[in-house]
């Protein structure tokens, strides 16, 4: 009997110890969660490190050479993480593996967050290198021949954007009763040169210049591939929807970091730094 009682007592102790261990782990995890949610606030004179997701192109340089140095006095140290497509930077931001990104325009952000149920918000616009029409076969828009193959981005917002640029140049006409930010190939009402539209992942468009007659390449991928804007047959007429934006999780908009970035992006200090940088000829934010 005594042995059974001791066994039961020892069993109770083991159960209690296990429960205590689990409780401790939960408490630690909760504390860790609180720390993460506050991680974008400045920290009593210490430097807060921020990882910004970027895609190939100029915006990683913009973060490292202009935005980062200007935020140093606010207590933030920015570094970039490179992604090779437009999908992963927003997913990484939503998951918390990065704290911000700079790689997309507002039309793309709005559509992607809606389609993927993400809670991300723009802090403001940055100077943006527009989409260009590139060709190794033709020297001008007027040279484009009947039946030419034209590559454009496959993702919804950039596909619509590319069709809009083709329409700006008189190469196609879109249906009049559609939302131009959601246009698809099926919304082409008139295609007088019988262009063959080929949709590709945006990251492949710069390489496609070698294999198609004409390619519409977003500015960041054109920059990364060494395609110069001056060599484009034409560039898009930018509006607010296609100006790139600096993005964070919505919960971080009012953090110290969110407030500092939002203030910086419309400041004379930022405008002056851009004017002296490699980005001086980019399309300017509509907020300037």
Describe each PLM feature range.
Residues 24-30:
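C-terminal motif of bacterial Sec signal peptides marking the signal peptidase cleavage site
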Residues 32-35:
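Bacterial signal peptide processing site
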Residues 49, 57-79:
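Short, polar/charged alpha-helical segment
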Residues 80-91, 178-207:
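Short helix-initiation/N-cap motifs at beta->coil->alpha
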Residues 111-123, 138, 211, 216, ...:
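Ligand-binding "clamshell"
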Residues 123-172, 271-272:
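A conserved helix-loop-strand patch within extracytoplasmic ligand-binding domains
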Residues 130-141, 242-257:
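A bilobed periplasmic-binding-protein/Venus flytrap-type ligand-binding module shared by bacterial periplasmic
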Residues 157-182, 262-288:
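Ligand-binding clefts/hinges and TM-proximal coupling segments of bilobed small-molecule sensing domains
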């Amino acid at each position: 009997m005594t042995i059974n009682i001791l066994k039961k007592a020892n069993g109770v102790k083991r159960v209690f110890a296990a429960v205590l261990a689990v409780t401790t782990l939960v408490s630690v995890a909760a504390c860790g969660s609180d720390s993460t949610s506050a991680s974008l606030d400045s920290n009593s004179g210490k430097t807060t490190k921020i990882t910004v997701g970027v895609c190939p192109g100029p915006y990683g340089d913009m973060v490292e050479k202009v935005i980062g140095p200007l935020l140093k006095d606010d207590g933030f140290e920015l570094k970039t993480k490179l992604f090779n497509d437009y999908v992963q930077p927003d997913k990484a931001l939503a998951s918390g593996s990065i704290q911000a990104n700079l790689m997309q325009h507002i039309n793309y952000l709005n559509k992607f967050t809606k389609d993927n149920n993400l809670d991300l918000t723009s802090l403001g616009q940055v100077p943006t290198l527009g989409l260009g029409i590139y060709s190794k076969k033709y020297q001008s828009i007027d040279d484009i021949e009947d039946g030419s193959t034209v590559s454009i981005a496959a993702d919804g917002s950039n596909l619509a954007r590319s069709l809009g640029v083709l329409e700006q140049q008189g190469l196609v006409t879109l249906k009049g009763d559609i939302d131009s930010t959601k246009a698809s190939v099926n919304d082409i009402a008139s295609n007088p040169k019988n262009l063959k539209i080929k949709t590709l992942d945006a990251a492949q468009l710069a390489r496609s210049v070698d294999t198609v007659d004409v390619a519409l390449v977003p500015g960041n991928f054109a920059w990364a591939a060494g395609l110069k804007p001056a060599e484009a047959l034409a560039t898009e007429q930018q509006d607010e929807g296609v100006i790139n934006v600096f993005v964070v999780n919505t919960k971080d908009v009012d953090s110290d970091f969110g407030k500092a970035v939002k203030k910086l992006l419309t400041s004379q200090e930022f405008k002056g730094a851009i004017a002296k940088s490699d980005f001086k000829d980019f399309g300017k934010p509509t907020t300037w």
